[in-house]
Amino acid sequence: MSSEGFNPGPEAPQGQPALPNLQVVAQFIKDLSFENPGAAVNLTDRPQIELAVDLNASRLAEKDMFEVELKIRVDAKSDGRALFLLEVAYAGVFRLTNVPDIATQQMILLIQAPHMLFPFLRRIVADVVRDGGMPPLMIEPIDFLALYQARVAQGAGQPPQGTA
C-alpha cells in the first residue's frame, strides 16, 4: 500500500492555506457528584428525567490550546420522590490550529469539540447510574450545533475576554 499523496499533518500544498485542525490532547472527568436517595426504591414506573447541559470553552496559556468543558446534570424522580441526582463535568484539552479568527475558533470549540467528548461522557453517565442500582441511563445524542445557534441568538455568542 502506497502512502504517496498522504499528508498526515495540517500543512497544505504550497500556495493554499492550511486546513483547520482540531486535535484532542487530553480528556478527563473534572467533577463528578452522584446522590442516590432512591437506591432502595423498587421502580415499576419509568422515572421522570430532567437533563441540563452546559458548555464552556477557554483559552489555555499555551499557544493554540483550549479547554472545553461539557457539564451534564441529571435529576431523576418517581412520583415526586428523588431517585438520583448526577452532575458531571467532563473536559478535554484541544489543540486548534490554522483558525485565525475568533468566531470560527469559537464555533469549532463549541460544536465539534463537545461532539468529540460526548460519547465518553455518555458512557460515564450510564455507568454511574447503573452502579447506583438503577438501569443505565443512555442520554440521547445532543445537537451541539443547535445549542451553539441558540447561544448566538441569545447574544452569548461573544466570548468573554480571554476565552474562545
Q: What are these model-predicted stretches?
A:
Residues 2-116, 122-164:
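N-terminal intrinsically disordered, cationic/polar leader segments
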